[in-house]
């Protein structure tokens, strides 16, 4: 792995040139060269154009241009009306579009072309659904622009086709994108920040990111690609660090700058070997630091730019097209001041590494080049290193390579980059021992970490593999990981290996450590992995482990436990569960007690998708068993008849290692009882007697708490006033009885005793139908039906006296003619309203009580009490009213039957087709009531916006439909 160097900014050092013997860097405090104050400007974004003459200040109320060459400080202000602040503004960086700039406001991006007089709005890019957080222009193609948003998308726009993004990069994550940037060397790579993570995309293949980098612990505020190296970038974060990354080695940062406050921006200098960062103090209390760092050494900043009194919002580099030896830094702050800082040649020299540092750093590589081994001599990296090394002369002087012009910054001044940047950063000195310990993988298989002491510079580990244990102590020298200082390894007391095997393992450790430290790389984790592999191989060769213990490392087990870390998005199979059903049966299953759950640290296979595959592969099976069962686990108990001896009954034999499904009867813990449900009565001939009988049933089954309830129900059903015997309708109009009954039903329904609640609701639901006096007095037919002659010739006479009250309704319906009778219909409605009147349950409560009855009917179905269930369902008469309205009746083309649904269920074919697009209609539809033609509602609206006749038959659908609807209303 590449080394990591974590450095903190120190105190101000002493001045010294590059050739001074002191290692401290010069800490310069620099004031701004130019200063512009705009107190009335509310700009929140800033950008410098391609020529370096104009600075754009963009805000919610205006766009302003400041010419840097003028000393009067006047602004070219252009008003704009927007209720949102400008989140970011960027000028194009290609000369062919140098007058274009992109301004992001809320969810859209405006492309503005600056003319001689006023800005011209060329286009608006709309594709994001949340606020746009960052934009960046392509460095090679002037037509490409990338934007990112909180909606997690990064859109690449082509200005030649601005209606939609040319490419959308979707990061499947919960956090939005905060920063985005194109690669400055090739332009093919793109980096997007999502909180503390980075996604590296290749725009030639936008289906998925090419690299995932866990960069910071907090949000990333800035991304900047290197101007010289294609794969290197720097990030600034809320956690107070600036990190250098190489996307070829995304696992760890190359170098780290640590500050005491959040870092808002960090960008490479266009020339030289520096980086500028903005440090924002916590809660605005502290110094608003604008610091220049060297990429080769991060102990101290090179320069501090002072002058701003508030938070620096943004900064940009001002290219000098006439003189490329100098660059200028332009900053805009919340104190409403625009400052210009000059980066002179002395600052750029301080960013370069000293000659002593270069020579001391690469002396080991020179020694390797004198006696090269064939593989390393032919390695391309070795050739690159040899080409970038300083040239040694006989007198000890060191001649460096001549300076060159930078092709990436207008052919300007280009300082010789330090050799360790010209080659891969993986070969530079590594981080401290403390940082190496913090990056150590503590979940390595077979390895337990006992002690990690960075102060005393030693570590202790316990390795268990192949049935043996090794206690390893590693001691690090102060110069580790220099090529001449590998760590020292020692096997301590507690090691169970023989002296011969221990010597072989120590030799393996020293060889691996020497190979790593020769390249100034860390070696601890690689040595531990090599030790585990050598222990397995050596112990298996000498036969020093018991076979039963080696079963733990069998290929079958390793195959089952492998590569599960790659299946992080796949849910692990359920190994236990519990579920209730409606009648109180509890079903449970779990893994067997004798099964051993193993750790998931060593994974080389996929995560099992089902519980049976777990047991089949041996992941949860008894791996210490001598015999392995090849069959998959089954959730079912196998019932087999034991033959051979008479009188033997059926036995259940459980398979070895298979889970058992347990079914428990928990009905005794609930408020319902199957035995009581079988005996309960719903006889309505005498409701009081029925209540007395149900109360006695509760007493017999030990439910003494329900006896007072049925006693109250008996009192409700008993008439209390003599007048009620003359007219039983008075019995059902007692408000006290209605309130008491509804309170009892709701109390037991809420408490979970749905059985008692439903029985009470059914008993007092409606009038008795089996010869009760109330029904006989309620159903009184009109006088014309009592006579033997019907007023209509098509209605047969009805003998009401000979008919019972139970089938009166059916006779009335059967004897109706097709002609309409006012008197008969009115009387039937009156009879139905009287039937509702003879009930102690209000009509508004009936839908709720019907739901209780249907739920209790499902419980009776589970108990197989079908007759009781049918009796309960007879009392659910409050069905929802049919939906009334205009329906589209279409005819199926196959069966030629009229259908009121969009699909013919028997034929499995759609029946409603749009007359415009000829496609089946599955969503909102509309049709003419006169001609019947219609289709998708969107297509119909688009058609009738320009036409007033039907597209099929020429019918004036709008007028005819309005007339028919007026008649219906």
From Swiss-Prot:
Annotated Zn(2+) 4 binding sites = 933, 950, 953
Where is the protein localized? Lysosome membrane
Could you say which residue ranges form the zinc fingers (C4-type)? Answer: 891-911
Do you know which InterPro entries this protein is assigned to?
RWD_dom, WD40/YVTN_repeat-like_dom_sf, WD40_repeat_CS, WD40_repeat_dom_sf, WD40_rpt, WDR59-like, WDR59_mRING-H2-C3H3C2, WDR59_RTC1-like_RING_Znf
Main localization is membrane
Task: Cite a single GO BP annotation.
Answer: negative regulation of TORC1 signaling
Q: Where does Zn(2+) 1 bind?
A: 892, 895, 904, 907
Binding-site positions, Zn(2+) 3: 928, 955, 957
Quaternary state and partners of this protein?
Component of the GATOR complex consisting of mio, Nup44A/Seh1, Im11, Nplr3, Nplr2, Wdr24, Wdr59 and Sec13. Within the GATOR complex, probable component of the GATOR2 subcomplex which is likely composed of mio, Nup44A/Seh1, Wdr24, Wdr59 and Sec13. The GATOR2 complex associates with unmet in the absence of S-adenosyl-L-methionine; the mio-Wdr24-Nup44A subcomplex is essential and sufficient for this interaction while Wdr59 and Sec13 are dispensable. This association acts as a nutrient sensor to inhibit mTORC1 signaling in the absence of methionine.
What does the protein in this record do? Answer: A component of the GATOR complex, which functions as a regulator of the amino acid-sensing branch of the mTORC1 signaling pathway. The two GATOR subcomplexes, GATOR1 and GATOR2, regulate the mTORC1 pathway in order to mediate metabolic homeostasis, female gametogenesis and the response to amino acid limitation and complete starvation. GATOR2 activates the mTORC1 signaling pathway through the inhibition of the GATOR1 subcomplex, controlling the switch to cell proliferation and growth under nutrient replete conditions and during female oocyte development.
Q: What is this protein called?
A: GATOR2 complex protein Wdr59
State the species of origin. Drosophila melanogaster
| Highest classification ranks of the organism | Eukaryota, Metazoa, Ecdysozoa, Arthropoda, Hexapoda
Q: What gene is this protein translated from?
A: Wdr59
């Amino acid at each position: 792995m590449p080394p990591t160097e974590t450095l903190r900014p120190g105190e101000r050092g002493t001045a010294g040139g590059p050739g001074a013997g002191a290692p401290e860097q010069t800490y310069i405090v620099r004031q701004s060269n130019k200063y512009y104050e705009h107190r009335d400007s509310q700009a929140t974004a800033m950008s410098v154009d391609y020529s370096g003459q104009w600075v754009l200040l963009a805000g919610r109320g205006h766009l302003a241009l400041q010419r840097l060459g003028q000393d009067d400080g006047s602004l070219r202000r252009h008003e704009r009306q927007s209720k949102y602040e400008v989140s970011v503004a960027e000028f194009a960086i290609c000369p062919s579009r140098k007058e274009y700039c992109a301004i992001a406001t809320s969810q859209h991006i405006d492309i503005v072309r600056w003319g001689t007089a006023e800005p011209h709005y060329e286009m608006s890019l709309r594709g994001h659904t949340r606020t746009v957080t960052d934009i960046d222009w392509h460095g090679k193609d002037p037509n490409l622009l990338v934007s990112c948003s909180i909606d997690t998308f990064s859109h690449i726009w082509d200005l030649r086709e601005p209606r939609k993004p040319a490419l959308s990069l979707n990061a499947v994550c919960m956090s939005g994108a905060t920063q985005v940037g194109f690669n400055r060397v090739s332009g093919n790579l793109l980096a997007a920040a999502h909180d503390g993570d980075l996604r590296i995309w290749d725009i030639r293949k936008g289906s998925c990111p090419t690299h995932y980098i866990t960069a910071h612990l907090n949000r990333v505020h800035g991304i900047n690609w290197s101007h010289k190296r294609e794969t290197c970038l720097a990030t600034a974060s809320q956690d107070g660090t600036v990190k250098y990354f190489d996307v070829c080695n995304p696992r760890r940062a190359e170098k780290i700058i640590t500050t005491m406050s959040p870092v808002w921006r960090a960008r490479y200098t266009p020339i030289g070997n520096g980086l500028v960062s903005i440090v924002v103090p916590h809660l605005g209390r502290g110094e608003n630091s604008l610091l220049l760092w060297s990429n080769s050494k991060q102990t101290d900043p090179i320069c501090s730019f002072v002058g701003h009194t508030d938070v620096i919002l943004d900064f940009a580099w001002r290219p000098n097209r006439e003189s490329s030896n100098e660059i200028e830094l332009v900053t805009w702050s919340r104190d409403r001041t625009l400052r210009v800082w000059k980066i002179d040649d002395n600052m750029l020299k301080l960013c370069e590494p000293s000659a002593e540092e270069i020579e001391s750093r690469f002396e080991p590589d020179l020694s390797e080049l004198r006696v090269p081994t064939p593989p390393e001599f032919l390695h391309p990296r070795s050739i690159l290193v040899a080409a970038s090394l300083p040239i040694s002369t006989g007198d000890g002087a060191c001649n460096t390579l001549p300076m060159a012009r930078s092709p990436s910054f207008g052919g300007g001044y280009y300082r010789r980059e330090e050799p360790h940047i010209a080659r891969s950063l993986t070969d530079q000195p590594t981080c401290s021992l403390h940082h190496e310990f913090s990056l150590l993988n503590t979940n390595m298989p077979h390895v337990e970490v006992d002690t990690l002491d960075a102060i005393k510079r030693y570590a202790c580990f316990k390795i268990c593999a192949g049935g043996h244990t090794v206690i390893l102590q590693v001691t690090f020298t102060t110069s580790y990981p220099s090529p001449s200082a590998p760590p020292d390894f020692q096997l301590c007391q507690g090691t169970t290996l023989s002296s011969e095997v221990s010597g072989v393992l120590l030799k393996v450790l020293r060889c691996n450590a020497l190979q790593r430290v020769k390249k100034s790389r860390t070696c601890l984790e690689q040595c531990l992995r090599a030790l585990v592999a050598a222990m397995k191989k050596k112990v298996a060769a000498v036969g020093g482990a018991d076979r039963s213990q080696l079963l733990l490392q069998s290929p079958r087990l390793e195959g089952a436990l492998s590569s599960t870390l790659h299946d992080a998005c796949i849910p692990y199979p359920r190994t236990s569960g519990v579920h209730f059903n409606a009648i109180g049966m509890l079903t449970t299953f779990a893994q067997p007690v004798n099964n051993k759950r193993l750790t998931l640290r060593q994974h080389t296979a996929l995560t099992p998708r089902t519980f049976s595959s777990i047991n089949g592969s041996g992941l949860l099976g008894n791996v210490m068993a001598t015999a392995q069962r090849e069959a998959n686990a089954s959730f079912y108990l196998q019932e087999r008849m034991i033959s051979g001896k008479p009188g033997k009954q059926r036995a259940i034999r459980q398979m070895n290692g298979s889970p058992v499904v347990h079914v428990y009867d928990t009905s005794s813990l609930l408020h319902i009882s199957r035995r009581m449900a079988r005996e309960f009565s719903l006889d309505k001939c005498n409701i009081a007697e029925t209540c007395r009988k149900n109360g006695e049933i509760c007493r017999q089954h030990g439910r003494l708490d329900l006896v007072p309830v049925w006693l109250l129900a008996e009192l409700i059903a008993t008439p209390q006033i003599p007048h009620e015997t003359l007219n039983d309708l008075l019995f059902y109009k007692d408000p006290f009885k209605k309130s008491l009954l509804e309170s009892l039903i709701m109390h037991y329904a809420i408490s979970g005793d749905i059985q008692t609640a439903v029985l009470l609701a059914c008993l007092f639901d409606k009038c008795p139908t089996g010869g009760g006096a109330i029904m006989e007095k309620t159903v009184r037919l009109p006088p014309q039906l009592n006579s033997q002659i019907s007023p209509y010739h098509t209605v047969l006479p009805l003998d009401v006296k000979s008919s019972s009250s139970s089938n009166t309704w059916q006779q009335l319906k059967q004897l109706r003619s097709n002609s309409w009778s006012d008197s008969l219909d009115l009387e039937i409605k009156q009879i139905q309203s009287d039937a509702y009147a003879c009930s102690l349950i209000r009509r508004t409560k009936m839908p709720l009580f019907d739901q209780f009855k249907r739920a209790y009917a499902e419980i009776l179905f589970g108990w197989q009490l079908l007759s009781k269930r049918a009796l309960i369902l007879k009392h659910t008469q409050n069905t929802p009213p049919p939906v009334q309205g205009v329906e589209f009746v279409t005819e199926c083309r196959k069966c030629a039957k009229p259908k009121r649904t969009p699909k013919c269920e028997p034929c499995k074919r759609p029946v409603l087709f749009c007359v415009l697009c000829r496609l089946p209609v599955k969503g909102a539809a509309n049709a003419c009531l006169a001609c019947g033609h219609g289709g998708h509602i969107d297509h119909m609206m688009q058609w009738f916006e320009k036409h007033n006749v039907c597209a099929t038959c020429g019918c004036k659908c709008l007028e005819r439909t309005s007339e028919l609807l007026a008649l219906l209303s």
